[in-house]
């Protein structure tokens, strides 16, 4: 039996055997029966409480039926809709109304027909009751014209309400604000982009250096973060200070890759690791002790050395900045502003920017003995901002913003955005642009531009501040479970988030539903015919993602119209023309070599646009200029194009299909005469 229990962990053993071992020999079947019994009991108790008029039990039932937490609770979206309807009618609860709006907006599982008017009604009530998700959904609907006429100012009002909630939550945290959630990853990015590495805009050019693409490359190479951490630990234990510092950063931010902009900017969600403040402090303290062997009995008695040009502290100064921040915020240690100030002063001796920023917060807010000194605070913030520290630039911008010096404030906020600020700077810039848009004296064209900027920035703030109801993170966990039930739950959560305007959720949902991945689609080996309903849903999500500046999604839209996926009822001519327009829109960004190649092929074959070999060659050339990885397909296409043109010219053609001309000695053009061969484009 011991041997059998060990065999169940071997990958070469058939799954039906390991399942048997797990259930029969490991006691799994008995445990399953116990858990199933507990789930039935929970549902029975909640049903009984709901029948007795307990509205919280009614809402809990609706959540269990719509978002079952595990396999013991079966999904029952139809029951969930009925329970949400009852709960909303009895209590007017905003959360129930928001989910009812989702059902009517999407027609999920055909429980109710799609009715955008009813969706609008439920979401409006929920939004006015303060439900942030409903406010975001309303803002997105007015911004995109879903069920309503596009109205930027109305969209701005809804997104402002959501962003204000998020900012209030952010400011309720420790000094410096709450820790930002990690940036969620797109499923397609983890595979090198929608079209794979090399062909997708998401993984070519400057985008190839994005943390999520580095993570995708690491996964493709079979690397695991546990192996990386073990390697770093091995080198750190040998006294390699740079590896110890990297480990401290990784465990502090809970991610292998941090965002630009400083400590406060968060990290990448694709390279997530378990966050461990105690381990981070261990490594930072080990580094710092190489310069500061001991601490004074009273940190308030610490005095900065008078030496004007102290020797370089290297990583110790950087570690001091992190240690000061941890004491300032109570992360892994007891919150102690005096200790924080001591560590910040140590780092500031060596000009470390995080330490300058931390001292600015302490003096501005009077966190040590209530002593405030705005002049000192501004001096420290300026020193950090001069080193492109995003958070310090935000603090300087806020200082001018509070004094109504909006022009100077904008300068600092814009500098913070360039330095990598992912949150606060956008909030205040949105407020400034909103005031411009609402000013009656502002010209209409400027007001419209300011409104669009304000909506975009408020939307970004509302979507980043997900400390509660983080649908993207919950969906990621469900998807990574690997079970069919988990994947179905993940898609539901992405769908809810997509209706609230999250481009990541729209991309994920479209990518999962995408039926145009197989290169065999148009051969006799093609898989079964795609579902037009599923393709239509994917097309909708691709369109919404493309409208939020996802270039690969824009190319996908062209593919769907070209292949007739989700638009089978439209005539081919119309579909090809629309496909060409989408490819052209993507090509105009000068980032998608694939879109340019597609356009070249359509010009070459006269599909969706007039046949023109000159424009075909031009787009093939542009594809290669945009992405050198397109060398092989572009060269093959050019060879074929010139062969076609040569045959056309031999037959006497002289129109836009003739790429071949000869220049005679007089400089005139003639065909097939001695002279210098020139390819014309």
Predicted feature residues:
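Short coil/turn linking the two alpha-helices of tandem helical-hairpin repeats
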Residues: 1, 62-74, 101-112, 139-149, ...
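Short coil/linker segments at helix-helix boundaries
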Residues: 2-37, 72-75, 114, 143-153, ...
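Hydrophobic/aromatic packing residues within the alpha-helices of TPR/SEL1-like helical repeat arrays
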Residues: 46, 84-85, 123, 159, ...
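Short helix-capping/linker turns of helical repeat alpha-solenoids
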Residues: 51-58, 67-69, 90-97, 104-109, ...
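TPR/Sel1-like alpha-solenoid repeat signature
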Residues: 58-61, 97-104, 122, 135-141, ...
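Catalytic cores of eukaryotic secretory-pathway lumenal/extracellular enzymes that build
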Residues: 93-95, 102, 112-116, 120-141, ...
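Terminal, low-structured helical/coil segments at or just beyond the last alpha-helical repeat
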Residues: 234, 627-681
């Amino acid at each position: 039996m011991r041997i059998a229990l060990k065999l169940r962990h071997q990958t070469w053993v058939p799954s039906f055997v390991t399942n048997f071992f797990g259930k029969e020999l490991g006691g799994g079947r008995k445990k399953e029966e116990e858990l199933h019994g507990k789930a039935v009991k929970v549902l029975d108790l909640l049903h009984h409480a709901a029948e007795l008029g307990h509205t919280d039990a009614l809402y809990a039932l609706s959540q269990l039926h719509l978002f079952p937490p595990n396999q013991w609770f079966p999904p029952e979206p139809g029951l969930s809709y009925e329970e949400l309807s009852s709960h909303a009618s009895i209590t007017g609860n905003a959360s129930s109304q928001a989910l009812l709006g989702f059902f009517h907006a999407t027609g999920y599982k055909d429980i109710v027909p799609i009715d955008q008017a009813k969706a609008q009604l439920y979401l409006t009530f929920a939004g006015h009751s303060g439900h942030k998700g409903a406010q975001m959904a309303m803002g997105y609907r007015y911004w995109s014209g879903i069920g309503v006429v596009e109205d930027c100012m109305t969209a701005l009002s809804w997104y402002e309400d959501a962003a204000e909630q998020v900012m209030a939550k952010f400011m309720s945290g420790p000094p410096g604000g709450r820790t930002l959630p990690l940036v969620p990853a797109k499923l397609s990015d983890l595979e090198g982009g929608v079209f794979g590495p090399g062909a997708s805009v998401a993984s070519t050019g400057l985008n190839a250096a994005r943390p999520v693409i580095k993570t995708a490359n690491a996964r493709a190479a079979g690397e695991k973060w546990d192996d990386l951490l073990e390697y770093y630990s091995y080198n750190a234990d040998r006294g390699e200070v740079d590896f110890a510092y990297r480990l401290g950063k990784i465990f502090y931010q809970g991610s292998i890759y941090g965002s630009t902009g400083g400590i406060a900017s968060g990290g990448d969600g694709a390279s997530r690791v378990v966050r461990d403040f105690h381990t981070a402090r261990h490594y930072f303290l080990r580094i710092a002790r190489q310069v500061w062997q001991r601490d004074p009995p009273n940190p308030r008695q610490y005095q900065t050395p008078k030496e004007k040009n102290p020797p370089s502290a290297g990583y110790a100064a950087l570690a001091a900045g992190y240690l000061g921040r941890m004491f300032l915020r109570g992360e892994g240690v007891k919150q102690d502003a005096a200790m924080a100030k001591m560590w910040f002063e140590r780092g500031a001796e060596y000009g470390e920017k995080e330490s300058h920023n931390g001292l600015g917060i302490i003096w501005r807010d009077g966190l040590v003995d209530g002593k405030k000194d705005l002049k000192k605070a501004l001096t420290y913030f300026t020193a950090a901002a001069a080193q492109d520290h995003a958070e310090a630039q935000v603090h300087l911008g806020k200082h001018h913003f509070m004094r109504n010096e909006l022009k100077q404030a904008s300068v600092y906020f814009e500098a913070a955005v360039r330095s990598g600020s992912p949150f606060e700077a956008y909030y205040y810039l949105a407020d400034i642009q909103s005031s411009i848009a609402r000013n009656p004296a502002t010209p209409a064209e400027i007001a419209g531009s300011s409104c669009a900027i304000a909506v975009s920035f408020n939307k970004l703030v509302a979507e980043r501040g997900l400390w509660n109801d983080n649908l993207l993170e919950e969906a990621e966990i469900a998807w990574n479970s690997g079970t069919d039930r988990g994947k179905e739950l993940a898609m539901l959560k992405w769908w809810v988030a997509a209706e609230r305007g999250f481009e990541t959720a729209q991309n994920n949902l479209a990518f999962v539903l995408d039926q145009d991945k197989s290169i065999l689609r148009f051969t006799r080996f093609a898989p079964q015919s795609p579902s037009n309903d599923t393709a239509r849903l994917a097309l909708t999500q691709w369109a919404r993602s493309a409208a939020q500046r996802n270039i690969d999604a824009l190319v996908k839209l062209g593919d769907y119209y070209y292949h007739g996926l989700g638009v089978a009822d439209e005539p081919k001519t119309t579909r090809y023309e629309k496909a060409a327009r989408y490819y052209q829109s993507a090509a105009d960004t000068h980032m998608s070599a694939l879109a340019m190649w597609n356009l070249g092929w359509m010009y070459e074959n006269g599909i969706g646009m007039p046949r023109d070999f000159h424009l075909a060659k031009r787009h093939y050339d542009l594809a290669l200029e945009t992405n050198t990885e397109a060398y092989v397909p572009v060269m093959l296409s050019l060879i074929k194009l010139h062969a076609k043109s040569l045959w056309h010219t031999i037959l006497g053609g002289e129109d836009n299909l003739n790429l071949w001309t000869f220049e005679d000695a007089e400089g005139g053009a003639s065909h097939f005469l001695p002279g210098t061969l020139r390819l014309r484009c």
